[in-house]
Amino acid sequence: MDAQTRREREDRMETMIRQWGTSVLRTCFVCLSDAQQAEDAMQETFLKAWRNLDQFEKRNGASEKTWLMHIALNVCRDYRRSRWYRHVDMSRSLEDIPLHVNDALPEDRELLSDVLSLPEKLRQPILLYYYQDMTLEEIAEALGTSKSTVYNRLRKAEDQLRITLTGGDCYV
């Protein structure tokens, strides 16, 4: 790789980190519930993106955000499967959440706490749809599933959250 090409790759990665770094970090935190691990996962996400940038560039029309979220979710999944992760204290409080979420209203903090308590398959679509403003198509691509599966998981998660937040007294 010549110096010009390397510099172009570095510039592209710097732009991606500036543009999507916060979103990747939030996603990693919600998946891992640990600020330090989320930062490590974010770094690993961008390292994998750097290593595979050529493959991404061959995919015409692919979204950087969707590609990065797919990598981040896989990195988080690998972290959770590791033996070391099983020994991490998962009783973190919401005060550990980075990026100004602590300034949220008490109702918002309660909702976030309930979202964090959802099973992974339901938590991921909620996180990506409501907290990362991704479309159903982008979420489906990031999760490697169909749009209808994403839609169904969103509805199921919303139903569970509605029951949790209303104490089961919701008739919709």
Question: For each predicted feature, which ranges?
Answer:
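DNA-recognition helix of helix-turn-helix
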Residues: 73, 137, 143-168
